[in-house]
Structure formats: C-alpha cells, structure tokens
C-alpha cells in the first residue's frame, strides 16, 4: 500500500477549540495554535523548547530549526501564522502558512497545490466536454458523420407526423411482379395445394390423378347399333338436289 502524504491530508481538514475563541488575540494566538490536539502543530519545533524553558519568543532568533511566528493579525477575526525553517538569525525558509478565521484553523495551500488543482479542474472540464460531444456524434457509412441532439428528438416527438400516402403500383410493376411469381412457381412448384379455403392442403400428385378423365366403357350392343346406322346412311347416298323453278 502506497504511503499517504500527510501534507495533502492537512489541506482538507480544519481544527477549532471553542473554549479559546472568546479570549483569542495577538498575544494568545500562538498558545492556541500550540494545543496538543492541533494536527497542524509540530511538537519538535523551537516554540515548544522556548515554552518549556519559559523563555520569550525573542530567543527564537538565536535558535536553528522549525519555528512558528505570527505573520499577520486582524483581531478578532483573522490571524496568519507561518511555519518556517530558521538557518541563521537572518536567514529563514518558509514552509507553510496557516490562517485562523473565527477560531477555525486551516492550512493555506501552496502554489504547487493551487496550480495542480486548477489544472485538474480544467482538464476535467475539457474531458467532460469531449465526452458530452462524443455522445451526440453519429456515423453511418452512407451518411458520414453528423450531430444528433436530444432536443431534436423531443421536437420531433411533439411535432405531428404527416401520414405517408400509399402510392398505387403501375401496370409495369404489377406485370413484372406477376412474371417473377410465375417464374418462381415454375422453378419451385408447390408440394401441397389447398383446393378450397378452409380445407386441408392436398398433395399435388393426388390432385393430378383426380383431374385425369376416366375412359368410358362402351357395351358391344351399342357398338353394333352405331355400325348399322352408319351403313344405312352410306347406302342411301347423298340427298338429291331439287331443281329450281325458273
């Protein structure tokens, strides 16, 4: 597990002791800041040594190490305390600033933290804008790219849709469709046919057998009768033509 930077945690917390607020001033603000429950206070600082030896704060200038000083005071609301590294009586390195507003202590962010926060905020905004834009982008091979917004969908839903008129087919279209259906019927003949609506489909072979005419059987007596009639007609010969009267 990665180690957590304590300084980053201190930027997001605050500390307050309500019992000190009524008596808080320029002379007591450092004592208030040096409370044991204050997470911003470093107990290895020179202020703690001076406090234990009951010396004045002027002795801090003669010491080397971490110390806290009152940088600015605007009683009774605002106090600014600086944490610094003293290397000599005339040389110090600022480490952090703390501001007290109405008794509540906060750590002031350093320049790097401010820039980092601003950059992250800007990048997050740009990324959100790109994500939002990509959600409205559409693509189709035949149309290409276009924008599709939800407002257009709502307007299309509210707008009454015109009923599309069905155009009648032309004679050429009907003839062409009939020719295609006939061609398909010849290539793929049906195996079952429904003779009448509602009846059970019947195989095509069975319908062909029923459609074939049954040969009639002629009795021998009827054959002889027809022969005699034919002979009688042939014996008489053709009827004579009557002469026209002039």
Curated annotation (Swiss-Prot):
InterPro entries: Mediator_Med6 (IPR007018), Mediator_Med6_met/pln (IPR016820), Mediator_Med6_sf (IPR038566). There is a cross-link at residue 208 (Glycyl lysine isopeptide (Lys-Gly) (interchain with G-Cter in SUMO2)). It holds the Pfam family Med6. It is found in: Nucleus. Keywords: Acetylation, Activator, Isopeptide bond, Nucleus, Transcription, Transcription regulation, Ubl conjugation. GO terms for biological process: regulation of transcription by RNA polymerase II. One of its GO terms (molecular function) is transcription coregulator activity. GO terms for cellular component: mediator complex. Residues 206-226 have a biased composition (Basic and acidic residues). The modification N6-acetyllysine is found at residues 236, 241. Residues 193-246 are annotated as: Disordered. The keyword Translocase does not apply. Coiled coil: none annotated. The keyword rRNA processing does not apply. Its main location: nucleus. Component of the Mediator complex, which is composed of MED1, MED4, MED6, MED7, MED8, MED9, MED10, MED11, MED12, MED13, MED13L, MED14, MED15, MED16, MED17, MED18, MED19, MED20, MED21, MED22, MED23, MED24, MED25, MED26, MED27, MED29, MED30, MED31, CCNC, CDK8 and CDC2L6/CDK11. The MED12, MED13, CCNC and CDK8 subunits form a distinct module termed the CDK8 module. Mediator containing the CDK8 module is less active than Mediator lacking this module in supporting transcriptional activation. Component of the Mediator complex, a coactivator involved in the regulated transcription of nearly all RNA polymerase II-dependent genes. Mediator functions as a bridge to convey information from gene-specific regulatory proteins to the basal RNA polymerase II transcription machinery. Mediator is recruited to promoters by direct interactions with regulatory proteins and serves as a scaffold for the assembly of a functional preinitiation complex with RNA polymerase II and the general transcription factors. Belongs to the Mediator complex subunit 6 family. This is Mediator of RNA polymerase II transcription subunit 6. It comes from Pongo abelii (Sumatran orangutan). The lineage of its organism: Eukaryota, Metazoa, Chordata, Craniata, Vertebrata.
């Amino acid at each position: 597990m990665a180690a957590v930077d304590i300084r980053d945690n201190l930027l997001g917390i605050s500390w307050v002791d309500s019992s000190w607020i009524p008596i808080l001033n320029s002379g007591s603000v450092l004592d208030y800041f040096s409370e044991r429950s204050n997470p911003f206070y470093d107990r290895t600082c020179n202020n703690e040594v001076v406090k234990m030896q009951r010396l004045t704060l002027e002795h801090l200038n003669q010491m080397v190490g971490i110390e806290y000083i009152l940088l600015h005071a605007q009683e009774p609301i605002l106090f600014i305390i600086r944490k610094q590294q003293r290397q000599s009586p005339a040389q110090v390195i600022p480490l952090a600033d703390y501001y007290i507003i109405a008794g509540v202590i906060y750590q002031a962010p350093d320049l790097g933290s401010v820039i980092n926060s601003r950059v992250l905020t800007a990048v997050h905004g740009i990324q959100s804008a790109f994500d939002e834009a990509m959600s409205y982008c559409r693509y189709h091979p035949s149309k290409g790219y276009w924008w599709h917004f939800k407002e257009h969908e709502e307007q299309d839903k509210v707008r009454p849709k015109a009923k599309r008129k069905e155009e009648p087919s032309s004679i050429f279209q009907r003839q062409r469709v009939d020719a295609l259906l006939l061609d398909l019927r010849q290539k793929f003949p049906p195996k079952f046919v429904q003779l009448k609506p509602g009846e059970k489909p019947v195989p095509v072979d069975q319908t062909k057998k029923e459609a074939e005419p049954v040969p009639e059987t002629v009795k021998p007596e009827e054959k002889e009768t027809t022969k005699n009639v034919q002979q009688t007609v042939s014996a008489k010969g053709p009827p004579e033509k009557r002469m026209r009267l002039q």
